[in-house]
């Protein structure tokens, strides 16, 4: 039985549109293309779907207004282009959505907005309020102020985090390809489109190697986004943006594109927030016993199971937990700073106070502040 019924039963969509589908070969906004996207989104909204749009295009629009022929390499110049272009992008959307009497809202997010629990909850409340008011939020990364070190990396990731934030049913990533293929269609004429796969399928890992089918065209980031969205129970459709009326067809469950469906129970809201933390301050390496305790028993991480500590972090920072082979097992908020963690690693809880002169917690990371990768 097809999993497309997951889509037809869904009412809350996050739609991500990349620059290639909004601009005229990178030479500024393509108003005709934008009009077509707005028409489709307005049609979904009229049918009762809740839609949040994650839109690229600000940098390209700014470059055109500034008279730049090629994308600048310097981050401050990219940020300047984004600052100029963001207003143009929203003006273009406002002009088109007015044709359908639809209200829109501009929302700019950066990593700090989602890494702070309070700001995360505020963003969620704002987006929910906008949707209740029948306003379509248009979201982009706040390129003007963000630094390279804390960028989301791409709008695929941002869209997945937004899907988690609002507990969306479907994340729809529009691309310049028809979807995901089992091999590179540019090299293999017999390459077949993958219609449906579990978001956590190991087969996708094998394909996502440097020489695999997903190693080109940004598909690796789309798989990562699908897996992140799956944590809140959202399924992801990766589909070609050149298909006529693609969004209504996706909503109708047509067999187009690739559906990477969530086949696990959604994790709790706090753990969704933890899973979305992209910036970690350190790494703790675990022994096999600790790995088993986290994976199989869902317990807290005790110092005795830690073999090594790297990085510099303070209490409350995000750290990554890895096994002896370097594979990420989990991530969580640490109860001790890096210096103290090194002193107590490999030691039983009963020795913490002797080693540190104090003991605030038995656990290095409590299970409530830990999420499996």
UniProtKB/Swiss-Prot annotation:
InterPro entries in UniProt: AceGlu_kinase-like_sf (IPR036393), Asp/Glu/Uridylate_kinase (IPR001048), G5K_ProB (IPR041739), Glu/AcGlu_kinase (IPR001057), Glu_5kinase (IPR011529), Glu_5kinase/COase_Synthase (IPR005715), Glutamate_5-kinase_CS (IPR019797), PUA (IPR002478)
Domain of life from the UniProt record: Bacteria
Gene3D superfamilies: Acetylglutamate kinase-like, PUA domain
Molecular function (Gene Ontology), one example: glutamate 5-kinase activity
Pathway: Amino-acid biosynthesis; L-proline biosynthesis; L-glutamate 5-semialdehyde from L-glutamate: step 1/2
Residues binding ATP: 16, 175-176
GO terms of biological process kind: L-proline biosynthetic process
Stretches assigned to the PUA domain: 281-359
Enzyme class: transferase
Enzyme Commission (EC) number: 2.7.2.11
SMART domains referenced in this protein's UniProt entry, alphabetically: PUA (SM00359)
Alphabetical keyword list: Amino-acid biosynthesis, ATP-binding, Cytoplasm, Kinase, Nucleotide-binding, Proline biosynthesis, Transferase
Binding positions for substrate per the UniProt entry: 56, 143, 155
Compartment(s): Cytoplasm
Presence of the UniProt keyword Ribonucleoprotein in the record: no
Nucleus recorded as keyword: no
GO CC entries: cytosol
Catalytic function, reaction form: L-glutamate + ATP = L-glutamyl 5-phosphate + ADP
Function: Catalyzes the transfer of a phosphate group to glutamate to form L-glutamate 5-phosphate.
Family the entry assigns: Belongs to the glutamate 5-kinase family.
Protein's name in the database: Glutamate 5-kinase
Gene: proB
């Amino acid at each position: 039985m097809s999993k497309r019924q997951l889509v037809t039963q869904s009412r809350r969509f996050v739609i991500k549109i990349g620059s290639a589908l909004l601009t005229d070969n990178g030479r500024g906004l393509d108003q005709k293309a934008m009009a077509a996207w707005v028409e489709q989104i307005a049609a979904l909204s009229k049918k009762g779907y809740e839609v949040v749009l994650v839109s690229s295009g600000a940098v390209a629009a700014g470059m055109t207004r500034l008279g730049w022929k090629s994308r600048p390499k310097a981050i401050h110049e990219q940020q300047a282009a984004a600052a100029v272009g963001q207003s143009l992008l929203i003006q273009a959307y406002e002009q088109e959505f007015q044709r359908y009497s639809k209200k829109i809202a501009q929302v700019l997010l950066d990593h700090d907005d989602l890494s702070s629990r309070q700001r995360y909850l505020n963003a969620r409340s704002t987006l929910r309020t906008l949707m209740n008011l029948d306003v379509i939020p248009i979201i982009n990364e706040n390129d003007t102020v963000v630094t390279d070190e804390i960028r989301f990396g791409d709008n695929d990731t941002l869209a997945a985090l937004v899907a988690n934030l609002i507990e969306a049913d479907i994340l729809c990533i529009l691309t310049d390809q028809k979807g995901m293929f089992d091999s590179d269609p540019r090299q293999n004429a017999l390459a077949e489109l993958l219609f449906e796969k579990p978001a956590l399928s190991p087969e996708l890992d094998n394909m996502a190697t440097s020489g695999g089918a997903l190693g080109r065209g940004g598909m690796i980031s789309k798989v990562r986004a699908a897996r992140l969205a799956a944590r809140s129970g959202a399924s992801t459709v990766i589909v070609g943006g050149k298909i006529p009326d693609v969004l209504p067809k996706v909503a109708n469950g047509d067999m187009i594109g690739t559906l990477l469906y969530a086949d696990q129970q959604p994790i709790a809201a706090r753990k969704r927030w933890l899973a979305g933390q992209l910036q970690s301050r350190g790494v703790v390496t675990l022994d096999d016993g600790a790995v088993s305790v986290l994976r199989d028993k869902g317990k807290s991480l005790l110092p005795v199971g830690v073999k090594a500590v790297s990085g510099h972090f303070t209490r409350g920072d995000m750290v990554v937990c890895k096994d002896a082979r370097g594979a990420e097992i989990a991530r969580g908020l640490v109860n001790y700073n890096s210096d103290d963690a090194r002193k107590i690693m490999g030691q039983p809880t009963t020795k913490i106070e002797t080693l540190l002169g104090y003991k605030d917690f038995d656990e290095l990371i409590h299970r409530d502040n830990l999420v499996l990768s």
